[in-house]
Regions:
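Class I S-adenosyl-L-methionine
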Residues: 8-10, 15-21, 27-164
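Conserved SAM-binding strand-loop segment of SAM-dependent methyltransferases
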Residues: 1-7
Length: 164
């Protein structure tokens, strides 16, 4: 069945088990989700998300709105890195650090080191817009001084285990 509509407006709760949103910005992705409140319910559909831009901002939004990342895999295509995220609504909100949002769970995959290096290479330019003496500036400076593998490292998790 083919339906024409805006975002998820043509669907209702219980009609689908998985929703794929790919190739749009992080902001467009979360706006589509926000317009379908039935997605943000326990037992709701699994989301497979591939934001074209601002992966870290989408991770922050997901965690802040009660989603857990069941998977977060980096994929390189045409010289550009993408993050393929599988998210499920749990209702447990998480305030994540800049580092967690920047790298997500990508260190669980062989491609994680390349993704971390790509993310880290963008930090000097981003740092220019962050005021000195702030916690964010200190976190970015520490990342810039670390190796890519150290930057993305965190306590090991089993695949599919949400960040606590």
């Amino acid at each position: 069945e083919l339906r024409l509509g805006d975002g998820l407006s043509v669907l209702s709760a219980g009609e689908v088990g998985t929703i794929v949103l790919a190739g749009v910005s992080a902001q467009t992705t979360w706006e589509i989700i926000e317009q379908a409140p039935w997605v943000m319910q326990p037992g709701g559909p699994r989301l497979v998300l591939v934001p074209a831009t601002r992966h870290s901002e989408l991770r922050r939004w997901l965690w802040a709105h009660g989603f857990a990342l069941a998977a977060d895999r980096p994929v390189q295509a045409a010289g550009r890195w993408y993050a393929v995220m599988a998210a499920e609504y749990t209702g447990e909100r998480k305030e994540a650090s800049f580092t967690e949002c920047l790298f997500g769970r990508t260190d669980e995959w062989p491609e994680g080191a390349g993704y971390a290096a790509w993310q880290k290479a963008k930090l000097p330019r981003f740092r220019l817009g962050v005021p000195d003496g702030t916690a964010l500036a200190e976190e970015i400076d520490a990342l810039l001084e670390s190796s890519p593998s150290q930057a993305a490292s965190r306590p090991a998790l089993s695949k599919g285990e949400p960040l606590a």
